[in-house]
Amino acid sequence: HVVVEKPLAYSTEHAMAIARASRIGKADCMVNWPTTWQASVRLGQKLVSEGVVGKVYRFQFRNPDSMGPFSYGQVMTDRQLGKEWWHQEAAGGGSLLDYCCYGTILSNWYLGEKPQGVYGLKANFNHRFGDAEDYASLMVRYPEAVSILEGTWNTISSGYPSGPIVWGEKGAL
């Protein structure tokens, strides 16, 4: 059996190959989503499922106070950084997969629905040494709600709620 750190894969093609290998090898494959282990996140989902805020119309998630790969204090030149997988899109780098994936899994869990569509954008504002984005945002349409997700390696969140934040007909969490 295998536990994979989030996200499962870089592409649908890669995810299907993992699923195929799992079936052939008769091994379970599970994705670990560290945010789902947080007590506050689990309580929020419990309260939403119990109807505390009523019918949910909006879900929002922004990654917490983090500068992504710069959070760990490495001192590297731009050339060295450009060679790191974090900054190479083809290797799975970038803030979309690094942080927006948390909001995606949490909004699916909280809302209990499958998305109908998504609009997104990504940009590289400050990490010019690589081709992966350092900012991404998604607006996801569900049958009865919308989800707004943001993943960034550029902006410090201090004082700004990162989420999840849920708005419903009776109030917000």
Task: Give the positions of each predicted feature.
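Beta-strand-loop-alpha-helix segment that lines the small-molecule cofactor/substrate pocket
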Residues: 1-36, 51
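Predominantly a Rossmann-like dinucleotide-binding segment in NAD(P)-dependent oxidoreductases
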Residues: 27-28, 35-129
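Residues that form or flank phosphate/diphosphate-binding pockets in enzymes
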Residues: 13, 39, 158
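C-terminal glycine/acidic-rich active-site capping loop/insertion
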Residues: 34, 70-82, 137, 162-173
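Alpha/beta-hydrolase-fold catalytic nucleophile elbow
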Residues: 5, 62, 167
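Contiguous beta-strand/loop segments that form the cofactor/metal-binding neighborhood of enzyme cores
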Residues: 98, 103-173
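Hydrophobic packing residues within well-ordered alpha-helices of enzyme cores
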Residues: 15-18, 40, 44, 149
